């Protein structure tokens, strides 16, 4: 079932077109990523989904209907701008957020205890928010979006500013939320996290959809074959080899992008035929970062 449907949505602020004719669908039990550089329209898109901003054009349906008050309690939202009631204790803060979303006091207290333990902050339950580190505060705000078991979770740059340990915790929790059937949509410019999580993604550039698909579809569209090698010899020879499209040097190693139909044995033979002594040779899958850089440069892959 489609939980979020955006069709041809656009939004301008004066002469600036922040979002242009953007369409996507998010199904239950999936994680959907909206990827783009800062200023590409990610936050504006999310605010339109939540009815904080009204689209100039297009249609947004949540659970198959336009946004209404009843839907608010079905959605969990982490905004890009972080903020907690700094003088409130963590327990009181989470219970308050839960009750705002329709939980009873007892339900909210039970959920608060569960989530605080889940993210490793049980000993901080009775501390004021201002006593927590920035990373701790961010985890509390994250779980405040989940405390009422929403069926739709929308997270705007959830990993921004987190250390690696806290990032792993959030990644794990997002997978857990997906497994219980929620639809999760998040925006990010941190590609390694998106690559681990998403079932489907949309790249946006200057407010426009430039690429949409599953991870497999996106990687298949950019079908160049990548090799990582270390050679004893002149690296400048690499760019002259058959089917080589691009060479990047990383110290004594090189990442070589070749045409999509290049077989590893074929490329290795070409290296040896050129008189190069190969010390390391491996085929690597194009990363989402590689694809992202191409998309942001305006390359669209195969048609």
Question: What is the meaning of each model-derived region?
Answer:
Residues 2-6, 11-205, 211:
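ABC transporter nucleotide-binding domains
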Residues 68, 105, 215, 235, ...:
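Residues at or immediately preceding the N-termini of alpha-helices
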Residues 94, 109, 116, 168, ...:
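Generic structural signal for individual residues within well-ordered alpha-helical segments
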Residues 172-258:
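ABC transporter nucleotide-binding domain
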Residues 224-298:
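Short, charged/small-residue-rich alpha-helical element at the C-terminal edge
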Residues 299-303:
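Short, charged, intrinsically disordered terminal tails
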């Amino acid at each position: 079932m489609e939980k979020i449907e955006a069709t041809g949505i656009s939004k301008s602020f004066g002469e600036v077109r922040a979002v242009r004719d953007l369409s996507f669908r998010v199904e239950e039990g999936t994680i959907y990523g909206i990827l783009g550089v800062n200023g590409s329209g990610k936050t504006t898109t999310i605010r339109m989904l939540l009815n904080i901003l009204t689209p100039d054009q297009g249609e947004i349906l949540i659970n198959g209907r336009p946004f209404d008050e009843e839907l608010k309690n079905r959605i969990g939202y982490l905004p890009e701008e972080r903020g907690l009631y700094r003088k409130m204790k963590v327990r009181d803060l989470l219970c308050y957020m839960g009750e705002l979303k329709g939980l009873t006091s007892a339900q909210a207290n039970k959920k608060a205890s569960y989530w605080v333990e889940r993210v490793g902050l049980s000993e901080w339950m009775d501390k004021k928010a201002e006593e927590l580190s920035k990373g701790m505060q961010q985890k509390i705000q994250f779980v405040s979006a989940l405390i009422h078991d929403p069926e739709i979770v929308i997270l705007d740059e959830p990993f921004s500013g987190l250390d690696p340990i806290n990032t792993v915790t959030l990644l794990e929790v997002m997978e857990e939320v997906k497994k219980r059937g929620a639809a999760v949509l998040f925006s990010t410019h941190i590609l390694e996290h998106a690559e681990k999580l998403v079932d489907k993604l949309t790249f946006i550039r200057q407010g426009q959809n430039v690429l949409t698909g599953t991870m497999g579809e996106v990687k298949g569209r950019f079908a160049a074959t990548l090799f990582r090698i270390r050679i004893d010899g002149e690296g400048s020879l690499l760019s002259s080899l058959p089917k080589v499209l691009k060479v990047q040097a990383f110290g004594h190693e090189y990442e070589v992008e070749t045409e999509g139909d290049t077989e590893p044995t074929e490329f290795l033979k070409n290296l040896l035929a050129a008189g190069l002594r190969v010390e390391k040779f491996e085929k690597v899958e194009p990363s989402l970062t590689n694809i992202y850089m191409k998309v942001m440069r305006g390359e669209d892959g195969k048609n």
